[in-house]
């Protein structure tokens, strides 16, 4: 029998203990705050580890790291980025293409804790009503951004990019940008379940495409143990990616959809240990 959304993870907590039912969540938060700390260590303490923001930065003033979407906008607008920016984009593209799926979204993005909080509150207070918008709208928005950059000759997304805006706000203070971040929080809380990360964000859409054939993946390796409690579906920001691996015995046990954020919450909340985080070659996934 399916559990209520507000009770998602309770069985796992009782059966596996706190650490094993929150392990991947804790590790993700540590990773997110570690990356954020590398950005903040310079302006706050004078120790520059990551110099810049989430769109473009230098690691130890040496290794460039550039958001691929910003680079694509620059190319589309007719402006060839500097060699250091192109190098940074290649590094990030190769890194996430090899690692897999949307690891940036769940392990690095500073907005993820905010949207996670909104959706935890949604479950906690039984806010089950949700507007319906197509998940592919993020890919449409991605194309619109690139076409818009080509037509205007500007990096149009960077004017409102909430990911880089969040990083800048933490360094320079929350001004009007706080209103956009608050709007995203309320959108996820009151309008569309997993609305930003699961439906709209073009940054996540691009990382999903880049990492679609990467190494790291989630697999329902012991799906025969599934008791249909639905806790994994309740907490997953992209629950449609779990249907085939969990419910269709003819499908590969691996989550092969590029929409998967590899956040590990399905692993945490499953009281039967159906899921593992593994490599794409270990369970016979379709390529």
From Swiss-Prot:
Regions of this protein lying in the Periplasmic compartment: 51-79, 161-170
Cofactor comment text: Binds 2 [4Fe-4S] cluster.
InterPro entries: 4Fe4S_Fe-S-bd, 4Fe4S_Fe_S_CS, Electron_Trans/Redox, NapH_MauN
Side of membrane Cytoplasmic, spans: 1-29, 101-139, 192-287
Organism classification: Bacteria, Pseudomonadati, Pseudomonadota, Gammaproteobacteria, Enterobacterales
Mutant phenotype after disruption: Deletion of both napG and napH genes has little effect on the overall rate of nitrate reduction during growth in the glycerol/nitrate medium. However, during growth in the glucose/nitrate medium, the double mutant shows a decreased rate of electron transfer that correlates with decreased NapAB activity.
Keywords for the protein's UniProt record, in alphabetical order: 4Fe-4S, Cell inner membrane, Cell membrane, Electron transport, Iron, Iron-sulfur, Membrane, Metal-binding, Repeat, Transmembrane, Transmembrane helix, Transport
Necessary cofactors: [4Fe-4S] cluster
Gene: napH
Residues that coordinate or bind [4Fe-4S] cluster 1: 226, 229, 232, 236
Transport recorded as keyword: yes
Membrane topology: Multi-pass membrane protein
Domain 4Fe-4S ferredoxin-type: 217-247, 251-280
Protein name (database record): Ferredoxin-type protein NapH
Main location: membrane
Binding, [4Fe-4S] cluster 2: 260, 263, 266, 270
Top-rank taxon, per record: Bacteria
Entry function: Required for electron transfer from ubiquinol, via NapC, to the periplasmic nitrate reductase NapAB complex.
Subcellular location: Cell inner membrane
Pfam families for the chain: Fer4_10, Fer4_5
